[in-house]
Regions:
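N-terminal [4Fe-4S]-dependent radical SAM core
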Residues: 1-7, 270, 275-279
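Distinct, well-ordered alpha-helical segments
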Residues: 64-66, 88-95, 155-164
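Radical SAM enzyme [4Fe-4S]-AdoMet core and its adjacent flexible, acidic
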Residues: 112-126, 133-277
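Active-site beta-loop-alpha junctions enriched in small/polar residues
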Residues: 55-57, 82-84, 107-109, 149-151, ...
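Aromatic/hydrophobic pocket-lining residues that form the small-molecule binding cavity
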Residues: 31, 35, 63, 92, ...
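Hydrophobic faces of well-ordered beta-strands that scaffold small-molecule active sites
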Residues: 4-8, 50, 77-79, 102-104, ...
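Acidic (Asp/Glu)-rich catalytic clusters
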Residues: 41-43, 93-98, 164-167
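Conserved alpha-helical substructure of the radical SAM core
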Residues: 1-80, 86-90
Length: 279
């Protein structure tokens, strides 16, 4: 049994250096046609949505081709992005044409705090606000999610964030900082407890009780076996106990790969931002 959603990491390239990032670095990329052939095959087996992620997915030279191809296959597409593509008219046009949902990061109501947690792009906070302002003037029905990683640095600077946005998101999702891959040093100094995260989430839900935005939380271990990642090298992975675990490769025997996925991924609980709660 396959999940309804696959997170396709088009590239591991990124133009930011976020200290909490758990993205992997993949140097070897297989032929794009092989990746698309696999996605076309699983589309016929029930997978119906793709989250395009990375790295920063819009940095891939194949980004436009991937969008067009997956859209033609009948996939519903979401984009998890840092927003840096917005100044490229051609990429922006493709995103607005093909993507149903955009997830953008905001780490604080305070621009200085946000920019300290999202280094690499000058005035990133201001850039996100500009994107939201531009989206508010379009007549396109694009669903919006704002994501925030809660740390010791920003936990006290989140109240009122929704009030400063020019466009009200459908979902504001807060993530408890989790350790994975290369962010262990940051995790050790910035991690907040389950109790602190729960209280933060509750307080924000109360503060913004009259908002139409749904405020939800993702706890540190919520991710276990609830994602299926497709890497640019053709590997399929999931997360177990905050570590990425190899399931197999798209070149593996179909029966073997399906069995591995059904064993290692909780296909009924795969996280997708296409559900009503964008979880």
């Amino acid at each position: 049994m396959l999940p309804s959603t696959i997170d396709f990491r088009i590239t591991s390239k990124c133009n930011m250096q976020c200290p909490f990032c758990f993205g992997t670095k993949v140097s070897h990329h297989i032929n794009l046609s092989s990746l698309l052939a696999f996605l076309e095959k699983v589309r016929k087996k029930g997978v119906d949505s793709i989250v395009l992620t990375g790295g920063e997915p819009t940095l891939s030279s194949d980004f436009g081709t991937v969008l067009n191809s997956l859209y033609d296959m009948g996939y519903t597409l979401a984009l998890s992005t840092n927003g840096s593509f917005w100044n490229s008219p051609s990429i922006r046009e493709d995103v607005l044409r093909y993507v149903s949902c955009i997830s953008l990061p905001l780490e604080s109501v305070d621009s200085a705090v946000h920019n300290s947690l999202r280094p690499g792009i000058p005035k990133h906070y201001e850039m996100i606000q500009k994107i939201l302002q531009d989206l508010s003037t379009t007549k396109l029905n694009i669903r919006l999610k704002i994501s925030t990683v809660v740390t010791k640095t920003n936990i006290g600077t989140l109240s009122g964030l929704l009030n400063k946005l020019p466009l009200e998101p459908e979902i504001w999702k807060l993530y408890q900082l989790s350790v994975c891959n290369s962010n262990e040093k940051f995790y050790n100094t910035q991690h907040i407890s389950d109790k602190q995260f729960r209280e933060c989430l509750y307080q924000l839900q109360q503060t913004h009780a009259t908002s139409a935005t749904r405020i939800v939380g993702g706890y540190e271990f919520d991710r276990d076996r609830k994602y299926l990642f497709l890497e640019p090298n053709g590997e399929l992975k999931t997360i177990v106990h905050n570590q990425e675990v190899l399931i197999g490769h798209i070149s593996d025997n179909d029966e073997y790969l399906s069995r591995r996925i059904s064993i290692m991924v909780d296909t009924k609980q795969v996280k997708t931002i296409f559900r009503t709660s964008f979880t």
